[in-house]
Amino acid sequence: MKNPRKIDLIVVHCSATRVNQDFPVEALEACHKARGFHSIGYHYYITKDGMVYPCRPENEVGAHARHYNAHSIGICYEGGLDEKGKPADTRTPAQKDSLEDLLYGLSLDYPDAEILG
């Protein structure tokens, strides 16, 4: 089904959790609901094992990038901080592979979208 929203951005986020901390999709959902969202604000979540969890339908506006939500797709990967809490690329090989595959598919669906993150 074609998305009725005009998507011109695909935004990649991290969960801003430490590399040695597990943050499963259930924890992400609880965190977002505690912030007042009706569900996870991202459209996709990628855990350390490379599993891609669809979270919000693409035709639904996300809650991940203020002022850009109406025309973007949001992806989040688990991690993003080293053991000391400093920003770091903590993506596992499985996450990198899954992210690449997901971005490829989304780029086919939204060929004019810019990828940020």
Identify the residue ranges that each predicted region occupies:
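Active-site-adjacent loop/helix surface patches within enzyme catalytic domains
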Residues: 1-115
